[in-house]
Regions:
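Active-site lining segments that contact anionic ligands and/or coordinate catalytic metals
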Residues: 48, 80, 152, 157, ...
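Short, intrinsically disordered, charge-balanced linker/junction segments flanking boundaries
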Residues: 162-170
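Amphipathic alpha-helix face/heptad-repeat signature
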Residues: 86-93, 120-123, 127-130, 158-161
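C-terminal helix-coil-helix/basic helical segment that borders enzyme active sites and/or dimer interfaces
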Residues: 101-115, 128-161
């Protein structure tokens, strides 16, 4: 069974044993330890490690959710996380767009700003359009989640589009 424990989502007073945020916060519970820090392509500020349980005994009062449903709950956290990744990606895309727009407005070629050239202005328009479309996908996925509706597909679509837009814009 897999599960996720974070300080943001766990009542640490209720779940003293598994309130894991960082390896150094790991309580001295027999059979519970943090693995190596994972090397990630992005979002390096988030410390991601495996939680190793070797013959660990979790007291009943520290069990969260239904025993045997940990993997299902884990997958649900990934769905919600996709909304956050989409939001971060769109922020990156917007920052890149604003910088590109600023640069295209001040960079002169042939006596005029390069923003006035069709090739550059089309690229800027495409960036703005894709950012706006990604934002709508993100808001829709977030609205579905907030209103208790299924959002798995929409969250995945928002993350895909937003991360693609961020890569193109950068």
């Amino acid at each position: 069974t897999s599960f996720i424990v974070t300080k943001d989502t766990v009542d640490l007073a209720r779940c003293r044993t598994l309130g894991v945020g960082h390896a150094e916060d790991l309580p001295k519970t027999k059979g519970v330890r943090a693995g190596k820090k994972e090397e990630k392509m992005g979002w390096r500020a988030s410390d991601t490690r495996e939680l190793i349980l070797e013959d660990a005994i979790v007291p009943k009062e520290n069990v969260l959710g239904t025993i045997g449903e940990g993997f299902v709950n884990f997958l649900k956290t990934l769905d919600a996380g996709r909304i956050g990744i989409a939001a971060v990606s769109l922020g990156i895309a917007e920052g890149a767009y604003e910088e590109a727009l600023r640069y295209a407005s001040v960079r002169k070629q042939f006596g005029q700003a390069i923003a006035s050239f069709q090739g550059v202005s089309f690229q800027l328009a495409d960036m703005a359009t894709e950012i706006q479309a990604g934002t709508h996908l993100l808001y829709h996925a977030a609205w579905l989640k907030q209103n208790g509706r299924p959002f798995k597909q929409e969250a995945a679509m928002a993350k895909l589009m937003a991360s693609d837009v961020a890569n193109k814009a950068a």
